[in-house]
């Protein structure tokens, strides 16, 4: 059922309203930050009645979790697709380079959303479930081509280089990333665990 509307006015079915609110919440966060995100702003961005906010979500924290959950799932899926397409050690290294230069934080919006989530996770351990799951999926995707120790280093390398690329004002940033990519260890089957 939809939230009640004004008396005498027919209610239109809107099965996608909840999804639109979640997407609009991410847009509002990207523009105003978490601190500037309110029910009123999100409702206006989603073009829904204000009452829809509390109908579909228990509160702003509930909405933020849903929105950032969607963002991290989509980011992890892109990471998995890129690494999954690699078939050789050389392609795995190229995939890492492409993740940095094209996929992760590909837009200013993605950069802002990521850092807003990091700030929340630093303050509220509950949000670390989202960031930890994101890291787990990223390392699992890398693990198709690299051993566990290398995966942890590469995950941090991708994160750090991506932030530097996104914030760098010099146009040669992408060239520098590609040069660093050529220094990465060659991919290959993960090393077997040592005997216990």
Sequence positions of predicted segments:
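Helix-turn-helix
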Residues: 17-20, 24-66
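Hydrophobic/aromatic-rich alpha-helical bundle segments in the mid-to-C-terminal region
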Residues: 126-136, 144-196
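Solvent-exposed, amphipathic alpha-helical segments
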Residues: 20, 24-31, 78, 113, ...
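Functional cleft and adjacent loop/helix regions within the main domain
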Residues: 68, 138
């Amino acid at each position: 059922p939809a939230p009640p509307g004004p008396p005498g006015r027919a209610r239109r079915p809107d099965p996608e309203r909840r999804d639109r609110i979640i997407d609009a919440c991410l847009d509002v966060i990207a523009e105003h930050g978490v601190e500037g995100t309110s029910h009123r702003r999100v409702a206006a961005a989603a073009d829904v009645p204000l009452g829809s906010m509390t109908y579909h979500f228990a509160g702003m924290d509930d909405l933020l979790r849903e929105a950032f959950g969607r963002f991290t799932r989509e980011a992890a899926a892109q990471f998995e697709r890129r690494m999954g397409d690699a078939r050789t050690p050389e392609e795995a290294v190229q995939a890492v380079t492409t993740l940095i230069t094209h996929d992760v934080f590909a837009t200013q919006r993605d950069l802002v959303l990521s850092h807003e989530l990091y700030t929340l996770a630093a303050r509220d351990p509950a949000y670390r479930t989202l960031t930890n799951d994101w890291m787990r999926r990223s390392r699992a995707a890398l693990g198709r081509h690299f051993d566990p120790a290398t995966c942890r280093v590469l995950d941090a390398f991708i994160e750090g280089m991506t932030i530097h690329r996104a914030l760098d004002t010099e146009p040669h940033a992408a060239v520098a990333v590609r040069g660093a990519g050529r220094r990465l260890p060659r991919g290959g089957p993960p090393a077997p665990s040592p005997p216990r």
